Amino acid sequence: MRIQLPIIRTNSDSHPGGRSALTCRFRCGDACFHEVPNTTTNPYVGDVIADAVSRRTTLRAAAVVTAAAAVGGAATVAAPQADAAVAAGAATTERTGTFSRGARGLRFNPVAPNKNDVVTVADGYGQNIVIRWGEPILNGAPAFDPDNQTAKAQAGQFGYNCDYMAVLDMPHERHQQVLVINHEYTDEVLMFAGYDAANPTREQAEIAWAAHGLSVLVAAEDRRSGKLTAITRHRLNRRVTATTPFEVTGPAAGSELLRTSADPAGKRVLGTLNNCGGGITPWGTVLSGEENFNQYFGNAEKVTDPTTAARLKRYGISGGASERKWERFDKRFDVAQEPNETNRFGWVVEIDPFDPESTPRKLTALGRFKHEAAEPRLTDDGRPVLYMGDDERFDYFYKFVSSKRMMKGTSRAAREHNRTLLDEGTLYVAKFIGDSPAAEIDGSGKLPEDGEFDGRGEWIPLASGNKSYVEGMTAEEVYVFTRLAADKVGATKMDRPEDVEPSPRTGRVYIALTNNKDRGAAGKAPADEANPRNANKHGQILELAEGWNDPAADHFSWRLFLVCGDPEDPSTYFGGFPKDQVSPISCPDNITFDAYGNLWISTDGNALGSNDGLFGVATAGSRRGEVKQFLTVPLGAETCGPIVQDRRVLVAVQHPGELDGASVEKPASAWPDGPGKLVRPSVVAVWRKDGCDIGV
C-alpha cells in the first residue's frame, strides 16, 4: 500500500461546528442533517416567568453549594464533605469544604489556536504515545499490519477511535494503572485502502465489529517522568467488541421489547456499539454509554407497523440501507427482519476491569437513549446517583437514584451486592426554568438584567422498578423508549447535553452542551435561558446545584458557567472573568476535574477555525471563568476522554486526519508516525518536565 504525503485540507461544507462531512458520516450517520427526532412542543426554559423577580430573590437567599461525595475521572472517590449552605455566588471558605478549599487557578502559558499536525502542549510539558489503534494487547495477537488486517487480529488489538478513558489504581502495584478505553466508531475510508462504500466486504465488516467496543489494558509509569507505557499481554488486558456477549439486567430484562429470534428470552445481547462518555463507580467498575447506535441499522423504511415505525423514528432510525451495510452480513442489523434488535442498544454498559472473565452488562434501569455520560455521586447514606445526557439536538438531561446503599470494601459479598445497585432505583428527567422575563432572552446571547443566565429546576420521575409515573406507558416502555416518556412529562429540550461531571470538591454538577445549529430555526425550539443563543455554533457549560446539598433531591438551582465562542463575540460569557484574558473555546464535549477543583474541557468540532484542544478553567475564586488552552490535537482530530491527575494528563486523540477528501491513499494527516504511515487514533500522556503538579 502506497501512502502519499498528507494534503492539508480545510472544511468548507456546511456541517455544524468545525466537523468534516467525513466525521459526520461515520460518527453519527449525519444526525444533524436528518429531521430532529424530538418533534414535541414541550415547554422551554424561560416559558414559565410568572413571579420572576420574587422567585429570583427567594432562590438567592436559599441557594446551596452541594458538598457530597463525587467520582472524578480517576479511580479515587472523594470522601463526603461537610454540608454548606451559602448564597449563590458568595465567597466560600475552607471551613465549608467548598470551592475555595485548596482551589488554585491555572498557571501555564496557554497554547495559541493553531492548525498544527501534531499534539501541541503548553511550554514546559512533555508527551508520549501510550497506545495506537491496532497495537496488540492480548496474548497471541499479532503486530498491526495495515495491509493484512483481519477480524481475528483486531479482536486482540487496541480498537479504533478511542474516546472515554477511565484510570484505576492497580492493586499492590504502585507504578501500574488499569486503563479502560472505549472505541466510539470506525471510519472505513481511513482504515481500508480502496474502500468501496457501496460494496464493503464481510471481512471489512467483521474487522469493524472487532474495532468497536472497549479495551482494558495495564500501563506502567516511568518513575522519573510522567511517561506511561502500555503493558501488552497483561493478565488483566481484555477486548470487548460488537460481538461480545452482554447480560441484560434491571427492570426491562426479559421484556418482550428486547426479545429477538436469536435471543427469545431478551436477556443476552451480542456486543456494544458507539460507546462515548462514561464513568467510574465507587465500587470499581466502569460505565460506558452507547450513543449513536441508530446508524448501524438498515431497512427501517420496510417496517409497516405504525407504532414500531414511530418508535424507531424517535430514535433516529429511518430510511433504507445503513452506511456500513452490516445488514448484508448479519440480519440482526436489518430492522425489517429484527425490529427489536435496535432496542438492545442505547444503554449504559458496565464492565469489571479486574475480572477479565466477567460478563459485561447492559443496565436497563438507567433508560435507553443516546447516552453520552454516566457520572456517579453518592448520597450521604451511600446510595449512588448517576447523571446522564442524551446527545441529540433538543433532547434531555437525566439522573438515576439507586434505592440501595453501597457496601464498602472489596469482599466477594460487597462486590456481588454492589453490582446490583444500578438495577433498582428511580429514573428522572430534568425540567429547567429560567428566572428572567422572556423579553430579556432574545436569542442573541445578551445577558439578562440580573447579569447571569440562571434559574431553578425540578426532577420529574419517570419510573421506579415496575412502577411507571408516565401516563399511558408501562414501566418497561419507559425504560426502553425513555425519550418518548420524557416527551410526555414536559422535560426541557437542551442543546445536545453531552458529558456531565460532578465537582469532587463541591458536588456541583457541570453539563457540557456542545452546540445546536437548529436552536431558534423556523418551527424549532426558540432560545431560552439555559440555551440562550439561536443557531448555537459554540455551545455552553451549565452549572447545577442540587437542593439541600442532596444529589437525590427533587429540585435544583442552575446557572450558565460558560457561554463559549470567540471572546470578542458579545454573546460569549466566561463566568464573569474579563473576556480579553481568556482562550477562545468552541464546542465543549468531555469534561473532568483536577484535584484543585479546576474544570478541564475537551472540544469536538471547533467552529472557530482551529484544531480541537483541551482547556482548563478555574471554577471558583478570583480566576473563576479564566479559560486557558492546555493543548491542541492534530489536524482533523477530536480531543476525547481527558484524565487530569496530579502528575499526568491523558487524552484520546480520536479520528486524526478525518477531513473531507481524505483516504488511506491520500491522507490529510501524518500523525502519529510521520509521512508514509497510516494515520492512527491513539492515546497520549502529557506531563510536566519539572515533575510538579499539572496546570498549577
Show which residues each predicted segment covers:
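N-terminal export signals
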Residues: 51, 57-83
